[in-house]
A protein has these predicted regions:
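Short alpha-helix plus adjacent loop in nuclease-associated cores
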Residues: 106-125
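Conserved C-terminal guanine-recognition region of P-loop GTPase G domains, centered on the G4
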Residues: 26-36, 41, 64-73, 83-99, ...
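Flexible beta-alpha connector loops of hexameric P-loop NTPases
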Residues: 18-23, 52-57, 115-120, 159-160, ...
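C-terminal-of-GTPase-core extension/linker across diverse P-loop GTPases
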Residues: 1-14, 32, 135-209, 215-216, ...
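Short, acidic/turn-prone active-site loops that include or flank metal/cofactor-
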Residues: 105-109, 229-230, 344-346
């Protein structure tokens, strides 16, 4: 990794500003958790209020002087802002304060770098870091030369900075190629599971909502779970048995956070695609968090960004032990499970969650008897490609008589791809049954 991270125990002065024009403000408490997760030691938190950021140093001259004094009093080596800084603001602040300055994006990137355990996760974090740093490259990064052999690589008349920028671009391009291979392999794996009719369930949620604890409780897997932000970064897949459904692939994905940097969403697209193509999303929510509604909005915003906003979703209100609340299932107007209240830590309500998962996934499977004319060969081929055909025979007129079983979502996607109306093939009872909504 090519990123200057806070050293363990490094003393930091923190800055949090409320802007009057902002509808959605950062959370100072969450900011402190982020700083501690990165390994820095918060010395003091300076707060303030402004109409808008100062274009040169983000804060005004008075707050800048406060920062100088706080840095001197606490002998801080680092200043961390709970906001996104422009490259020029970051440079100007470093000149004024004579120390390193990190913004919220850099802080989150650092935590991701520490949490990445697999080769894929490390590549994705490195890509996000390099793209973030490409706009902040103002001094020689001679260690990049070692990636390419060093001497003899500089073009005629190139400065060290120009050389480093070129090497940085080359490294970014190389990582993109490697991640393209990862995406391709993941896509092949998902297609194989689809052909084998194995539904997939992805756990999503705000960071520290308890996804990994719930994942462990459902699978008896040993996924790292801790009371800290971004304890899980790399996706973990496990096969579990769900009553009335059979084998199901359960995926634990990276936690989301307020104002998750766009570059991270892009870099982790291969990982997040597990959620985007799931048969069912399980949105894990910290029921005891006073900001839970805001957190739900943030998660749904990221899901929309990766094209997963409209997938079938079951909400799980976790940590009910902190509310002294009882496990239960809440259902929608048509009797389908909508919300399950559980405590993954104490194992309460897990049998209700298993029941809800069974209902949700069994509800998604459809059985059809189809008679297809010879000119409907594309539809017949598509159903065979999905491994959905259980029996096929032909009548005297040459029609293909198919017995079909497949996830309803796969059938609707096939119909959309072929430009056909799904209702023309579905029984009336299935036509009236709407596609699951989040």
């Amino acid at each position: 990794m090519f990123f200057e991270r806070p050293d363990a125990g490094e003393t930091a002065v923190l800055v949090h500003v409320d802007f009057q024009d902002e509808q959605e403000r950062e959370d100072a408490g969450e900011f402190l958790e982020l700083v501690r997760s990165a390994g820095a030691e918060p010395a003091t938190l300076l707060t303030g209020s402004r109409k808008r950021p100062d274009s040169r140093t983000f804060v005004g001259s008075g707050k800048l002087e406060e920062l100088r004094e706080a840095k001197a009093v606490h002998q801080a080596e680092l200043v961390i802002f709970n906001h996104a800084l422009s490259p020029s603001q970051e440079r100007n602040l470093e000149r004024e304060l004579k120390c390193r300055v990190i913004d919220r994006t850099g802080l989150i990137l650092d935590i991701f770098a520490q949490r990445a355990r697999t080769h894929e996760g490390k590549l994705q974090v490195e890509l996000a870091q390099l793209e973030y740093m490409s706009t902040r490259l103002v001094r020689g990064w001679t260690h990049l030369e070692r990636q390419k052999g060093g001497i003899g690589l500089r073009g005629p008349g190139e400065t060290q900075l120009e050389t480093d920028r070129r090497l940085l671009r080359a490294r970014i391009k190389a990582i993109h190629k490697r991640l393209d291979k990862v995406r391709s392999q993941r896509s092949q794996n998902r297609r194989a599971r689809s052909r084998a009719e194995i539904p997939s369930v992805s756990l999503v949620g705000y960071t520290n909502a308890g996804k990994s604890t719930l994942f462990n409780a459902l699978t008896t897997a040993e996924v790292y779970a801790a009371d800290q932000l971004f304890a899980t970064l790399d996706p973990t897949l496990r096969r579990v048995e769900i009553e009335d459904v059979g084998p199901v692939v359960l995926a634990d994905t990276v936690g989301f956070i307020r104002h998750l940097p766009h570059k991270l969403v892009e870099a982790f697209r291969a990982t997040l695609q597990e959620a985007a193509e799931a048969s069912l999303l399980v949105h894990v929510i910290d029921a005891a968090d006073p900001d839970r509604e805001l957190n739900v909005d943030q998660v749904e915003g990221v899901l929309e960004e990766i094209g997963a906003r409209d997938l079938p979703t079951l909400k799980v209100m976790n940590k009910i032990d902190l509310l002294d609340s009882a496990p239960r299932i809440e259902r929608d107007g048509e009797g389908r499970p909508e919300v399950v209240w559980v405590s993954a830590q104490q194992g309460k309500g897990l049998e209700l969650l298993a029941q809800a998962l069974s209902e949700c996934l069994a509800d998604d499977i459809i059985d059809l008897e189809l008679a297809l004319a010879p000119e409907q060969g594309k539809l017949r081929a598509g159903l065979h490609e999905l491994n959905a055909v259980r029996e096929e025979r032909f009548d005297e007129a040459g029609h293909s008589l198919l017995t079909v079983r497949l996830p309803r979502r796969d059938f609707l996607q096939l119909m959309a791809r072929l430009g056909e109306r799904a209702d023309d093939y579905l029984p009336t009872t299935l036509q009236e049954k709407p596609v699951w909504e989040a």
